[in-house]
Regions:
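Helix-to-loop junctions at the C-terminal end of transmembrane segments
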Residues: 4, 116-129
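Intracellular juxtamembrane helix-capping segments at the cytosolic ends
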Residues: 170-184
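Helix-loop-helix hairpin linking two adjacent transmembrane segments in secondary transporters
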Residues: 1-35
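A late C-terminal transmembrane helix in Major Facilitator Superfamily
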Residues: 183-222, 228
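Extracytoplasmic gate region of multi-pass secondary transporters
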Residues: 63-120
Length: 250
């Protein structure tokens, strides 16, 4: 919103497109380099005529209870994450912030969450049991969204936004870290990641739509925020299961 008002929506959207263009250029370069490296290895290594099975043993991942818990955790945390990105400015606007200020607050939330995105995976990797991290993150989420629901002062809204930024970004990073922590091999981690992220993002994509529809029906952010708080409580239960020291396919 701030950039759109200063320039127009075209330039505001182009700013977001810039990192994507840079990413595509890097991806093309790395893809060519990898292709050349694979070709070199094929020339140097003897041909392996061993026939590999069509279906991997890791299809067992779909029968793993821990894998389904991971998928549910991923779905719930992504639901909260994308609802926050989509509707936080509107919620702040309804609490007295101008459209421009609410837009800047969303940027503030994402920037202040960067340290958590870097530090949470490091901390989680040093611990065998990550349940205390989950509890800390959930407390932050509950405080932040409860403040959005019941708070009225601008200062409290800023504090809530900061805490939400730390919590949701930290939780997103923790969810991705769990794929490596809950698998004994890279192959298992890949299978777990593919399953959990596919199902998780499929569900979470409905989050902003559902919350927006509820707001349209009720005309208030009270019920949508209650739905988010209930989702966070469910996320706590899933996090306590996933955070235990164990491995998928064991």
């Amino acid at each position: 919103v701030p950039l759109a008002r200063q320039f127009d929506w075209v330039w505001a959207l182009l700013i977001w497109a810039t990192p994507a263009v840079i990413g595509v250029v890097i991806w093309i370069y790395l893809g060519k380099a990898e292709k050349e490296e694979n070709a070199r290895k094929e020339r140097e290594e003897p041909i392996n005529k061993e026939v590999k099975p069509i279906f991997s043993d890791n299809t067992r991942i779909w029968k793993s209870g821990l894998a389904w818990q991971m998928a549910t955790f991923m779905a719930l945390q992504s639901f909260v994450f994308y609802v926050t990105l989509s509707w936080l400015p509107e919620i702040l606007h309804s609490n007295g912030f101008s459209e421009s200020s609410a837009g800047w607050m969303l940027s503030f939330m994402q920037i202040i969450g960067l340290p958590a995105s870097f530090l949470i995976p490091i901390l989680a990797d040093r611990l065998k049991d990550q349940r205390k991290i989950v509890i800390g993150i959930i407390i932050g989420m509950l405080f932040g969204f409860s403040t959005l629901l019941f708070g009225h002062s601008a200062i409290m809204m800023v504090v809530a936004t900061a805490i939400i930024g730390l919590a949701v970004n930290g939780n997103f990073a923790l969810a991705l870290t769990f794929f490596g922590l809950r698998a004994r091999t890279a192959k298992d981690a890949s299978s777990l990641s593919g399953m959990a992220q596919s199902l998780g993002y499929l569900f979470s994509a409905l989050g902003p739509v559902i919350i927006g529809a509820v707001y349209d029906v009720t005309g208030s952010w009270t019920t949508p925020l209650i739905i988010v708080l209930v989702t966070i409580v469910l996320l706590l239960f899933m996090g306590l299961l996933v955070g235990r020291d164990r491995y998928v396919l064991d």
